[in-house]
Amino acid sequence: MKDQRGLYYFPFPQNKRIRMYVREKDGDIWFRLWNADEPRLWDEHGWVPYGAVKRAESMYQGKKFDPGQAYDLQLALALIEEE
């Protein structure tokens, strides 16, 4: 999907108010979260390269949040390829 902010997918399909935007830059895939209920997140948090997501995964082991679901590399690549 695409809107004025760019390409996106729903990282939590049951919640259409949260979107994960994706782009390719400098040979890496970058992610940026947008939440309709917390619009300040868009301004406060910039684009995150996938490499940084992978490095941070260990901090979330055993916790409620799963970065692997939210930051879906395969889905991001498919969206970018479709574009």
Language model regions located:
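Amphipathic, interaction-prone secondary-structure segments
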Residues: 6-29
